[in-house]
Design a protein with these regions (language model features):
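Ferredoxin-reductase
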Residues: 1-80
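Short, Lys/Arg- and Gly-enriched loop/turn segments at beta-strand edges
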Residues: 42-51, 89-99, 237
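A generic structural signal for residues embedded in beta-strands
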Residues: 36, 84-85, 227
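Short Fe-S-cluster ligation motifs
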Residues: 235-239, 243-280
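Structural signal for conserved beta-strand scaffold positions within catalytic alpha/beta enzyme cores
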Residues: 6, 51, 154-156, 209, ...
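Local cysteine-cluster metal-coordination motifs and their immediate loop/turn environment
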Residues: 112, 190-191, 212-242, 270-276
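FNR/FR-type flavoprotein reductase catalytic core
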Residues: 68-216
């Protein structure tokens, strides 16, 4: 029984659920993920762990409502339970020994970036946080980032909050000015991570990307999350989700991400119709 103990809407399309899962909370580390099913007939959704409280036995997940599965998950209320909650899965982000790190997040990917920034801060690492959103209304987790970052920069596409522009602008400025980052860790849309890597590679700044492709079982059996990394096939669920950004084939990953769009659109429409019927 994985009960929802707290629910919070972070913006009009992004929701945080705090779920009682003591065994997962006991072992969870920053960068790992879970697979959740809202109901018995729901699709399996991989979501990176956004936070955990070992004493209370709670695990937080943050998701954007985009398809049928996340719509079903978003329909659950405090006191209700999700059907499945499996994890922690994947490898934790490697942060030991890092002294000066820039964490770059984009959109809902900031939910993944936050626990990594927090873990770095807790071990005494200097953390520069750069996050990007389309506009002011979509900004999430600002207070939480400010609490764990030595320097924090918000970028918005339209300039309605923070600075106007994309995350690569302040990142390149920091590198050119001699920030001397040990590593850049980036999580967000594939196109954003691709351009972060294009920014850091000429300066030879090690860059780790968190890959979150389509996934079914989370154990490497289905092969749905395969990626090409350094010319070899890797599976995000067991080999990742973190990879050397210099070696990831982003173009292939973006192409694979579009393969199921028609099916997702059909499932979303069907779920919308069901929700309308329930309201009526």
């Amino acid at each position: 029984m994985f009960t929802i103990v707290k629910r919070r809407e972070l913006n009009p399309t992004v929701t945080e659920l705090c779920i009682h899962a003591p065994l997962i909370a006991k072992k969870a580390k920053a960068g790992q993920f879970i697979i959740v099913r809202a109901k018995e007939d729901s699709e399996r959704i991989p979501l990176t762990i956004a936070g955990f409280d070992r004493e209370a036995g709670n695990v937080s997940i943050i998701f954007q409502v985009v398809g049928a599965g996340t719509m079903q998950l978003n329909s659950l209320k405090e006191g209700e339970a999700v059907h499945d909650f499996v994890g922690p899965l994947g490898k934790a982000t490697e942060i030991e020994g890092l002294k000066n790190v820039c964490v770059v997040g984009g959109g809902v990917g900031c939910a993944i970036a936050l626990p990594i920034a927090q873990a770095l801060h807790e071990q005494g690492t200097k953390v520069t946080g750069i996050v990007g959103f389309r506009n002011k209304d979509l900004v999430i987790l600002e207070d939480e980032f400010r609490a764990c970052c030595d320097e924090f920069i918000i970028m918005t596409d339209d300039g309605s909050y923070g600075e106007k522009g994309v995350v690569t602008a302040p990142l390149e400025k920091k590198i050119v000015e001699g920030a001397n980052f040990d590593e850049v860790i980036t999580i967000g849309p594939l196109i954003m991570m691709k351009f972060v890597v294009k920014t850091t590679k000429p300066h030879n700044v090690k860059t780790v990307v968190s890959m979150n492709p389509i996934m079914v079982d989370g154990t490497g059996m289905c092969g749905g999350c395969r990626l090409t990394v350094g010319g070899q096939t890797k599976f995000a669920c067991v080999d990742g989700p973190d990879f050397d950004g210099f070696e990831v084939d982003f173009d292939e990953a973006m192409h694979r991400g579009t393969m199921y769009k028609p099916f997702e659109a059909h499932a979303r429409e069907a779920e919308c119709n069901l929700l309308k019927q329930e309201v009526q």
